[in-house]
UniProtKB/Swiss-Prot annotation:
Induction: Expressed approximately equally in exponential and stationary phases (at protein level). It comes from the Bacteria. Pfam families: YmjE. This is Protein YmjE.
Length: 54
């Protein structure tokens, strides 16, 4: 059981960062424009955290 959990956990952890990194690039321009027009660029930092939760 522990052996299966080790690879599974590692895969999920490694897959999480890259998957999130890939999402921001394509969505960054859209969010950047919306955030910039809605408020200051500081919102981008706050929205970035929201994206991760989403």
């Amino acid at each position: 059981m522990p052996m299966i959990k080790s690879p599974h956990g590692e895969g999920g952890c490694v897959c999480a960062p890259p998957a999130t990194d890939w999402t921001p690039p394509p969505l960054l321009p859209l969010l950047n424009r919306f955030d910039f027009r809605s408020t200051r660029p500081q919102t981008l930092l706050r929205r970035g955290g929201s994206n991760y939760g989403y």
